[in-house]
Every structure is written in C-alpha cells, then in structure tokens.
Amino acid sequence: MLDIAYIRQNPDEVAAMLRHRQLASEEPKLQQLLECDRQRKELVQRSDEQKALRNKVSKEVAEIKKKGVGSPDELISQMKAVSDAITAMDSRLSELEAEMENLLLALPNKLHPSVPIGRSAEDNMVFGEPVHFEHSLNFPLKNHLELGKALRILDFERGAKVSGAGFPVYVGKGARLERALINFMLDMHTEQHGYTEVFPPFLVNQESLRGTGQWPKFADQVYYIGEDDLYAIPTAEVPLTNLHRGEMVETNALPISYTAYTACFRREAGSYGKDTRGFLRVHQFNKVEMVKFTRPEDSYTALEEIRHHAQAILEALKIPYRVLLLCSGDISANATKCYDIEVWSPAEEKYLEASSCSNFEEYQARRSNIRFKPDSKSKPEFVHTLNGSGLATSRLMVSLLEHYQTADGHIRVPNVLQRYTGFTEI
C-alpha cells in the first residue's frame, strides 16, 4: 500500500505510474482518493474546532454550576448541538477513511526507475545473456508428458479423477525425484545462501492475504474454505511475510531471510484458451520460496542476491535459462521491480517461467504494519520486503525431464540430485 502523503504530494507521478502499468482506466479512482483525502482533512479540522468549542463550553457550564450564579441551560443546549455535530462529523469521517482504505488497497505499487516502460510481456527485456548447458539431445525428443507416461512417473489422468484437471500425481521414482528437487533447493538455500528454513501453514486468514497484496485484487485466484474462513496459500510468500505482521522487528536482526517449501494452490481463473497441458498450467504445485526483510537502503542489493540464489539452483542442475526484467505493463501490481527466470523446454522449443524475484519496497510492510527503528532515537520506519521463487518445481521438472532424457527413453538424474534419490537413472 502506498503512503497517502506520497500520493498527495506526487499525484502526477502516481497517475503516470498507472498509465505505465496500462491502468489508465484507474485514474478516476486516484482522483476519488485525492478528493476523499481533501474532504477528510477539512472534516478533521472542523471536528477538532467543534471539540475545542465543546470543551470550552463544558468548562463554562461547570464554572456556572460551581458559582451557583445564573442558568447554564442555554450553554447546555449549545453543547448538545455541538456534540451532535461532532457525532455526525465523526461518522462521516469513518466512512471517508474506510473508502480511502479500499482505494489505497486497490492502488498498485510505484515503479523503480530501472523498470522498462512497455505494454505487455512482449516488451520485457532479456537481462544479460541466456545461460546454456550442453546436453546431447541429437535424437527425436519426447515432451515431459510423453516421458512421464512412458516411465510411469507422472499420472495426470488419475489426478484428474481424484481432484479434477490441473492436479498432477507423481508416482514411484517421479515422486522421489520431486522430493529430491525440494530437499536439494532447501539445503542449498540454508547451507550456502544463509536462509532460515520455515515450514509454515498452508491455510491462511484473509488478513494475511491482504498483507501481501493478494487480497482483494486477486481474490478470484485463491481457493476459499468457507466454513473456516481460511484460504489455501497461492505461494509461501503469504505465510512467510505475515510471520512478522504487526511487529516491530529488531533492527540488529535485519536482514531476515526465510526459505520454505509449500504446496501452492491457484484457481488460475481466466486461463481458458491458454496452454494447459501437463505441468504448463496446474492448480496445485510445489515451490521453494525465498523471502527477505531488509532496511530500505539495502533492498535492491537484496533483490540481486535473491536472483543469484535462484540462478544458482539452475546452474547446479545444468538447466538452460534466461532472465527477464519485466516491463511496466507486465510486472505484478505489488512489485516495484521484478525479474522472471525462465527455463528452456527443448521439446516445446520455448522458455517457461520457473521463478519470479521481486522487490516490494514498503508496499507489503505498510499493509502488514512491519516496522523497525533505525536507531534508538529514530521514529519507526517500514521495512522493505522481497521474495523469489527458489524455485517452482513444475516448470523446472518439465525442463529437467526433457534435457536429461536419453535416446532409449530413460531419464538421467542430475549429479547433484543423486544423493537425494539414491538412483542415477529412471
């Protein structure tokens, strides 16, 4: 959530941000917010004046009663009228503040100056050079669906029977390989990258979704359990960030770095017509997440660290990939800057998103009220929060199976995973 003071002082800058994000249609809401803010300031001033008058009259009534000279009735009547006016103003003030809160929650984050201006994903910039690894694939390739079915390690049909489309089943060595990927990534992040492992809840309350920005904007993307008023997490970013919701974080504890494995659940509303085969679009998938809380001045250095940590996983697995710097029209509403890391699918002959690494600056911290004091004499400030997929296993599994397939239809297990699987080939 943006600071209303920043919006008030920089309305043209916020309007330009909306246009850069291809959200020019939201500008009337910005004007509505500014008008609510103007009315609120006027109302607060009038209410304060009336409260001062009420206090003055109240003292005069007390003085008359104390001296026993004259009648306070006229002043009491005046005080009642003032009190009624204050009640009405306070009621309207509550309405204005609620309206402002809703408008602020819906407003996207500002953009970092380095974010390229563009309309859609076609305008994203390739960051650096694509990274290649040599794999001997000089034979007719099978895609991940064909490999999974032939080797009986993936079963999408039975997953659909149990839960519906988009719920994969890993079987035998496929399940072992998935678990190996998760354990390898967690070990790398905790042992080499300095993260603390967390195993969080997979169900969260609405306040948690609100804190990280998934609510209310993406309410149609999450699974809701009505009887208990809980939501299945779309990403571990939600519970990890909300661990410190409403807290004053110890300054010497910053930066805080968490990593977690969770299953993730997404309805993917509006995905009709998109490629939904196999792992390309699923409702449940596994992901290892990285989340950081930093001082404001350190957050962009931390973003580069998170990106490097995600890339390190792919380099250890020898999976070809590229990094994209997302443009203003494709970046998420919550992020000020975001990198996507895409893995290459040799069978599909295209890149597939496997990780997003984002800086939210104080956007989530303001919504979640996560603060710190730079020093004992300073006022509290909001921390900056960041997150990165480190990584989602579904698209990663596509690339891994296709790159490590052999001419006779088997799968070689990457060297770094063999100590986790206990076998070298599927």
UniProtKB/Swiss-Prot annotation:
The keyword 4Fe-4S does not apply. It is found in: Cytoplasm. It is an enzyme of class 6 (ligase). L-serine binds at residues 235-237, 289, 389. Pathway: Aminoacyl-tRNA biosynthesis; selenocysteinyl-tRNA(Sec) biosynthesis; L-seryl-tRNA(Sec) from L-serine and tRNA(Sec): step 1/1. InterPro entries: aa-tRNA-synt_IIb (IPR002314), aa-tRNA-synth_II (IPR006195), aa-tRNA-synth_II/BPL/LPL (IPR045864), Ser-tRNA-ligase_type_1 (IPR002317), Ser-tRNA-synth_1_N (IPR015866), SerRS_1_N_sf (IPR042103), SerRS_core (IPR033729), tRNA-bd_arm (IPR010978). It comes from the Bacteria. SUPFAM superfamilies: Class II aaRS and biotin synthetases, tRNA-binding arm. GO terms for biological process: selenocysteine biosynthetic process; seryl-tRNA aminoacylation. Transmembrane segments: none annotated. Its main location: cytoplasm. Keywords: Aminoacyl-tRNA synthetase, ATP-binding, Cytoplasm, Ligase, Nucleotide-binding, Protein biosynthesis. It catalyses: tRNA(Ser) + L-serine + ATP = L-seryl-tRNA(Ser) + AMP + diphosphate + H(+); tRNA(Sec) + L-serine + ATP = L-seryl-tRNA(Sec) + AMP + diphosphate + H(+). It holds the Pfam family Seryl_tRNA_N. ATP binds at residues 266-268, 282, 353-356. Coiled coil: none annotated. One of its GO terms (cellular component) is cytoplasm. PANTHER family: SERINE--TRNA LIGASE (PTHR43697:SF1), SERYL-TRNA SYNTHETASE (PTHR43697). Catalyzes the attachment of serine to tRNA(Ser). Is also able to aminoacylate tRNA(Sec) with serine, to form the misacylated tRNA L-seryl-tRNA(Sec), which will be further converted into selenocysteinyl-tRNA(Sec). This is Serine--tRNA ligase.
